[in-house]
């Protein structure tokens, strides 16, 4: 029975639950790796890795790949996408139900490959970008890097199949009257993410496949001795790598839009503009990849183009930030836990974006490249963008998904812990970068000791917060119905939120701009067997 339900499942909701469990599992491993990294860097000299500098780089690779491919993408796209997208457009399931199943079940073998690569010979200590010649056969002669490449292949296939599924579902399975202009913002976010995945992943797969050939079959795509060029790999990788960071954050944009709207009791300001802004970000994201490569010897005109085109991305991003602020302005704001995360997201994502504008300048980036300033920048965007929106989405939708409620007070404590912890980790990294501390090193001169120690303290705070989050999930599953009594986050309210064209909204006690809260909680195995009508 269990095997039939969970192994052979073709039901989007069950597959989404599997994605969530997988994401939390991977996230715990990835966070543990980051804690080990920070403990090693807490003071100058060797702390806990006994001078094994290869192992340090292996931890960096493991942390990066786990957090990106095995936590954020399965969580935001696979989990929330599979569960909420059909509900938000009034579909009974995803378009290709069995394809959905294989999309998930390609991920555990990928995780096995990645973990196995850390158990073989000298492991893969290449940095998450897997640049040759360090990832070539001379520098890494063991099969570890090959296993890592297989893991990337499997996650890529998984994401591609999922992307095809999302696009087909939102194209074919919208309910009566749900035109594109009436689709909720989260659905738009998932569609735009799926298009980006579809266009960028094949390029990554091509790049790592060439690397595989270089390593095992004596080709010389990236081998200077045979007429190849490592810079080609960097172009292929970053043509995927830059859209990838938008793939990680755009579903978060969608979630934050829903939360800001619901807890301000207002429709999102400029909804169509928000869609255009997301689409512009996605389009421009494909035109800026070489800003990761200012120091490889691009000529001045190329650098000028990539500087200016990167700065242009700040415009649609600014439109989104100010539209969210306009949504909050004059709203009847309720500071439930999801709303706290959304407001923190706005503040911290903006800071991350501002440091990004500094890095966009080719002249400045020559100094900042490969320093901790870059680490601080992208962790502000990912840790306090993507991860905060994961938490926000969990606290917003999990009572609806599970029919069980979390402990509001514990959730507030967890929010403040991770808010403080994440800032204490990543703010000092900017200072270290300005002082010139390089990335991917396990040891450093004494001058950098102070801020590194502060950063490591923040890491411990954040890990405590994550442990508390795991406990909150446990408590939600055990005491979920008791918690319902004093939970403020749930989307119940007595007064009408805002005038709806749809009478069901107007008469229902549950207020949100989208239809998922009109269903039972938890929703039936197949919701919308009778099609809903969007007036």
UniProtKB/Swiss-Prot annotation:
Pathway: Energy metabolism; oxidative phosphorylation. It is found in: Mitochondrion inner membrane. Its main location: mitochondrion. Fe(II)-heme a binds at residues 63, 379. It comes from the Eukaryota. It catalyses: 4 Fe(II)-[cytochrome c] + O2 + 8 H(+)(in) = 4 Fe(III)-[cytochrome c] + 2 H2O + 4 H(+)(out). O2 binds at residue 246. GO terms for molecular function: cytochrome-c oxidase activity; heme binding; metal ion binding. Keywords: Calcium, Copper, Electron transport, Heme, Iron, Magnesium, Membrane, Metal-binding, Mitochondrion, Mitochondrion inner membrane, Respiratory chain, Translocase, Transmembrane, Transmembrane helix, Transport. Mg(2+) binds at residues 369-370. There is a cross-link at residues 242-246 (1'-histidyl-3'-tyrosine (His-Tyr)). PROSITE patterns: COX1, COX1_CUB. It holds the Pfam family COX1. Cu cation binds at residues 242, 291-292. Component of the cytochrome c oxidase (complex IV, CIV), a multisubunit enzyme composed of a catalytic core of 3 subunits and several supernumerary subunits. The complex exists as a monomer or a dimer and forms supercomplexes (SCs) in the inner mitochondrial membrane with ubiquinol-cytochrome c oxidoreductase (cytochrome b-c1 complex, complex III, CIII). PANTHER family: CYTOCHROME C OXIDASE SUBUNIT 1 (PTHR10422:SF18). This is Cytochrome c oxidase subunit 1. It comes from Wickerhamomyces canadensis.
